[in-house]
């Protein structure tokens, strides 16, 4: 050892410096010899008398390297294992999985809160928001929608997230969301437990379990939050609607939740982004088409004097390029304002056209349709809407005569000639919609030459080509399909027979209307369904209904009434009054009185027409007990209505008719001097009918 290490501090110091350190630092060596750093002086040091002895420390010589290094090392040294390394801040890379997508323009107020909840609380990754509000054709999930797409980590996380989202929307925003593909909490646990049990049994038996479709690993849940904002969307520059229906007020929010594998398989983002891009290109092509040079006039140009009125006729533009099978026409249904220099020429041309196209002889102007065409001197062609409106006001016999032999007949009557002449001047989509209206009118009037199958095909043609069909026209189609067959088609006993096939067609039309955003859960639709349920489906079904009890007889209509009560449909006074009459005529008196009492509660006070309907229905029923109760209860209530209903007019005749049904000998009782309530009402009605005025007996009954 003595041979290896030299004596003294130099040998040990050299050995320690030669050994490498694990931490990359050299060990600090302190000498074993205590070397004093005090400086020796040959002379005694002069000290101040004021300062105490030893109060001033000794200052080392700056040239003394040993003293300087020792003091700095002892005061600043910290062991390496206690030293804190400085944190090097590196720029954090934030992936798309950890980001909340940007909000679309004019988004509802709930959207940022919903995205934050989905991202932070539910823990869905790779969120993506797609704005579908600008699509011309609304998606199947509903018009005016915003779609949110997220990825769950597992099937269990997927179901739990969807369940929590539905509960949060119900409790926080009072919405009614529904989730397609969601399993309940207990149902998911039970299915997972059964799946694990089958896997254990299969592993013991040495077989495998086929898990292609176990009802759990669908990997896709669609949570539709419904309309989250009732305010209508911004008005567009053009009010013309193409595709399914009109603009729907309010914004819908739909959350699509996937597992990672299912999201890559479905590629929902690619589908809708391609649809949005295609829609954008179509709009751009339409804008470019409208911005092209004006079309060349086919006829000789006629100078037009500008009118001083505020009605401005805009220029009609035509594309310079002709697409395959493209046909565009500019239509005018109003009389153009012409200048003085062209008025005479235009009148001559109009007279020539009337002489060529319309027969204005006295023999030809014999029907109301001819008179309508003769009165329209501003247009060479009669508008189809005006023709159909005029046709709807005619009696049934005249309507059947004007419609000719059937839908193949186009020139047997003046109405058909003018209607199809007007169709030839219209665009393809307008002509298709006009044919649908004509079929609805013909079927509703029981014309045998127009079938419901042809109406269904015409509706599907408009649906296929995305022609605009208004909600009113859609309900007219449903009403026409639910029109009962006339008696002479099934024999005299088969009054009001509605086959099952016609009901199925009407329900399919309602399904198509609901898919394009039409609200089909309203009083009007349920009144149509109630009327349809009151008709038998066949001749044999009608005979069975007559032999069963009243409870069985009203069973189809009672189901519709229960649906109206359970769905809490918005109350519509006009449709409610129609439904009341249908309920009374079908024997559903409880439903009738329920709606009767609801009228003033929903801000629709009862009127004189309502009381006329009430007493007329009871008189037609010819039930003595119900007639007496109706008169004794509701005649005094007429003066308590707001505003009061006067006892005059047709309601007096209906009350007297109802009194004769309830008390056939009431006139003899009145002459005998009876003072019963019914006799007092009879006397008042009789005096008013004879022009003597009201004596106030009913008012005295109210006081009593």
UniProtKB/Swiss-Prot annotation:
Residue interval of the organelle targeting sequence: 1-47
Basic and acidic residues: compositionally biased ranges: 289-299
Coiled coil regions, renumbered to chain: none
Any GO CC annotation of this UniProt entry: mitochondrion
Keywords on record: Membrane, Mitochondrion, Mitochondrion inner membrane, Transit peptide
Regions of compositional bias (Polar residues) in chain numbering: 66-76
Location within or outside the cell: Mitochondrion inner membrane
The name this protein goes by in its record: ATPase synthesis protein 25, mitochondrial
